[in-house]
Amino acid sequence: MQLAVNIAVLASIYALICCGYVLIYRVSRVLSLAHGELMMLGAYGLYATASLFSGHPLLAVAAAGGLALAVGAAVYAALMWRMTGESVLAAVLATIALGILLRGLMVLVFGTQTQYPLRDLGWTNASFDVGGGARISAVGAALVLGTALVYGSLFAFLRGTRWGLRMRAAGQNPLLAAQRGVRLHGIYALAWALATFTGGMAGMLLASDAGLEGTLVTIGLKAFPAALVGGLDSLLGALVGSLIVAGAEVLLIHYVDPLLSDVVPFLVLLAMLVLRPWGLFGSREELDRV
């Protein structure tokens, strides 16, 4: 039972992170390799707002979420809109450069010391029994529930709202969407804002659980194989891919060797590239581009 809980928590972490990879790629066909740094920036945003709004934890969390949305839109407005119409390689290199810049700025501003935003908020990470002898921490439960809420909201948004339909149209046929009056730059900025928000949310929860330090970026990198396994243009694929990668990682750590933790996601990815290169829910048309 404890293994099942561990898989659910780790799958929620990966799903919440790779949701951003999928959103950006699905809408703008850009592969963002700065997502780990944007995730960590969201965590540092919570650390900053926790100090700024001391004694008001809910206000600090809301401010950190709003800051993540603003940062995502600003990244598109300041950099990524210039990549519209450029080659895939140029856009990917731009996100790599962005990630390096953000990592350096975060070290410069916040230093390298481990921070604990949950303590600054005045909250504790108590654990409780879920039956069968298994336990889950408060942050772990928040991760599972938060991921379910995010994906449910995104599915409803993309299928049932005007802006969601515009995002789908822009992703499927941007030229036709533009001819129909869809403002592509606004849609792309929204995709970056939502992706940074979900990534920042993952970063905030991870920092609340284990502390905030530079190695948080590597978790964002480990979530990338989950997005590829599921298919880069599918939110459902992101969920399934995250569950597969998390299940393999937890089981191999438990039964084989804990040192395999950083290797397992990429072993799963290699196996998927051999068996089904376009991912479980991806399409053959995306294979050449990926």
List each model region and its residues:
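Membrane-interfacial amphipathic/re-entrant helices at transmembrane-helix boundaries
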Residues: M1-C18, G45, F53-A60, E86-A91, ...
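Single transmembrane alpha-helix segments in multi-pass membrane proteins
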Residues: Q2-S51, A78-A90, V229-L235
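Helix-loop-helix "hairpin" substructures at the membrane interface of multi-pass membrane proteins
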Residues: L10, G131-L212, L235-V240
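Transmembrane alpha-helical segments in multi-pass inner-membrane proteins
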Residues: Y14, C18-G20, S54-G66, W192-G199, ...
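Alpha-helical transmembrane segments within multi-pass membrane transporters and channels
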Residues: Y21, S54-L98, L105, V240-V245, ...
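Pore- or pathway-lining transmembrane helices of multi-pass membrane proteins that form conduits
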Residues: E37-L41, M83-V107, L216-L228, D257-R276
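Transmembrane helix-bundle core of multi-pass membrane transporters
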Residues: R82-M83, V88-G160, I187-L190, V256, ...
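Cytosolic-side transmembrane-helix boundaries in multi-pass membrane proteins
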Residues: V109, Q172-Q179, R183-G186, V256-V290
